[in-house]
């Protein structure tokens, strides 16, 4: 159909316009896809083929991922997990993958339905904010890097106090960052403490810097039973750069004054020697980091909406985190409705959305994927690849530069058509005048 439109364009501009507008040719597909075979997907149970194969779900009805991709080597997924959950907690999976075009379909396994709070009177909304900030940095950085993996971070602490698991609930225990207990020779938490850690082996490291966002009560060994304001920082000993912040809210961990919980900011740090410093309350040190390697030319990541069926409470933090130009968000117009296994897996519309992984496309854009690169009923917004209506599209942040040649050619054709029409009108008018004169 596209070849016919191009072949007929010199004969009539109207047919070309008809192909583009009236027929809606080459409309963007609401799928997640890729420009080449150099792609990778990070997922959870909806793309965890190993879980399906080991548990014998018939016809792979558990998955949203096309079954044909199960042994492609392009998937890193774990049932019941997510990048955020693995980054912060003891229940983790070693997500590892590499590709030019990176796709994320995970995140739902840490949501309001789990209701995680550090403390009894904590605030799950704080953790939703942490989740959004975490994914925002991951998405942005993976638009510039090929490889993502997890690494452990070792530290050196000069005191005698040991790590403490202060932040946990019935199912999850936080171990990133690591909390160092109060030294026994201090009667309260009003003292400065520090520890050294080294980041090496990656181009950049994503690490958390977290503080309790209010007034923290001291331990039972604190005779004054005081409240403390948390203050943490990281200091790059090679460059002299500080990263840090203090708690600012008037909240606590009591029924009368609830809301005390961890607020985390995420930094992409370069390799080097660092010092973690606490000016008051507990010293925290990163124990895990996301390792970013192999810089690449800019390529936006694609994120598929990760949510439960309406029977469970979901959040939209991955959508909040996925911002253009470095991230393109994919969603469906309907809720998640699972098929034969349960309501949370094997959703028809999400299977259709992920079916685009079975083939390459010419262009990915904000509206979706364009299969052809010649003409389209819609001009690609933030397009990347060989996009329709342009011979070449390159991203120079944040402006798309379109090749003007097709537009120039259309203008030339329009000019020629006008000249031909004028010539024919003049010819027939002259010919009619001659015939009338002869008659």
UniProtKB/Swiss-Prot annotation:
Instruction: Tell me which family the UniProt entry assigns to this protein.
Output: Belongs to the influenza type C/coronaviruses hemagglutinin-esterase family.
Please explain the role this protein plays, according to its UniProt record: Structural protein that makes short spikes at the surface of the virus. Contains receptor binding and receptor-destroying activities. Mediates de-O-acetylation of N-acetyl-4-O-acetylneuraminic acid, which is probably the receptor determinant recognized by the virus on the surface of erythrocytes and susceptible cells. This receptor-destroying activity is important for virus release as it probably helps preventing self-aggregation and ensures the efficient spread of the progeny virus from cell to cell.
Q: According to its UniProt record, which reaction does this protein catalyse?
A: N-acetyl-9-O-acetylneuraminate + H2O = N-acetylneuraminate + acetate + H(+); N-acetyl-4-O-acetylneuraminate + H2O = N-acetylneuraminate + acetate + H(+)
This entry's Gene Ontology molecular function terms read:
host cell surface receptor binding; sialate 4-O-acetylesterase activity; sialate 9-O-acetylesterase activity
Disulfide bonds, which pairs? Answer: 49-70, 118-167, 202-291, 210-264, 322-327, 363-387
The entry describes its oligomerization and partners as: Homodimer; disulfide-linked. Forms a complex with the M protein in the pre-Golgi. Associates then with S-M complex to form a ternary complex S-M-HE.
Which gene is annotated as encoding this protein in its UniProt record? HE
Q: What protein is this chain from?
A: Hemagglutinin-esterase
Q: How does this protein lie in the membrane?
A: Single-pass type I membrane protein
User: What GO terms in the biological process aspect are recorded for it?
Assistant: fusion of virus membrane with host plasma membrane
EC class: hydrolase
